[in-house]
Amino acid sequence: MRLILLSGLLLLGTFLANGDETDPDGQVLNSLIETLMHLQREFANLKYAFLTVHKARSFGSGSERLYVSNKEIKNFEPLGDICSQAGGHIPSPQLENQNKAFANVLERHNKAAYLVVGDSANFTNWAAGQPNEADGTCVKADTHGSWHSASCDDNLLVVCEFYFIL
């Protein structure tokens, strides 16, 4: 959308710089201005629609972060690239409501998924007896949102975390 707006501005700028002797009444210029204004309104409408959907999904999950699965099953190695290419990150719930939103996805799919726990995490949800590095060096969440040590070779549900700074 921004590319279209920039193209319109470029055309308008070129037109103004060169002038147009075949359009003395300025019909082309007026048409370009009208088109640009229409595109600006459309962009504003799309932005509003996007923000409305984001707010509704955030409201429904109780979290400003969205957790989404592509339904694939993978080990930990490709997960960072998969999420990054989608514009997200490996899940890293920082608050209880974020962990609940993450767990809702796992419960819907009846599968566990990887997450990343930061060194300075203020929130954790380790299951009893966890973490246990004997089970592995990665971390997975079960369908209830409890965290467990896991092998990084386990094939788990691919879930990515998305959040928007507005």
From Swiss-Prot:
Signal peptide stretch: 1-19
Residue pairs linked by disulfide bridges in the UniProt entry: 83-160, 138-152
Recorded GO MF terms: carbohydrate binding; phospholipase A2 inhibitor activity
The keyword Methyltransferase appears for this protein: no
Keyword Ribosomal protein on entry: no
Pfam families: Lectin_C
Superkingdom to which the source organism belongs: Eukaryota
Major localization class: secreted
Glycan-linked positions: 122
Residue span, C-type lectin domain: 46-161
Expression sites (tissue/organ): Expressed by the liver.
Keywords linked to the UniProt accession: Calcium, Disulfide bond, Glycoprotein, Lectin, Phospholipase A2 inhibitor, Secreted, Signal
Record PTM text: Glycosylated. The glycosylation has no role in the association of this PLI and PA2 enzyme.
Localization of this protein: Secreted
GO cellular component, one term: extracellular region
Subunit structure and binding partners: Oligomer. Homotrimer; non-covalently linked.
Protein family: Belongs to the alpha-type phospholipase A2 inhibitor family.
Task performed by this protein: This phospholipase A2 inhibitor binds directly phospholipase A2 in the presence or absence of calcium. Has anti-enzymatic, anti-myotoxic, anti-edema inducing, anti-cytotoxic, anti-bactericidal, and anti-lethal properties against basic and acidic phospholipases A2 from Bothrops venoms.
Protein name: Phospholipase A2 myotoxin inhibitor protein
Native species: Bothrops moojeni
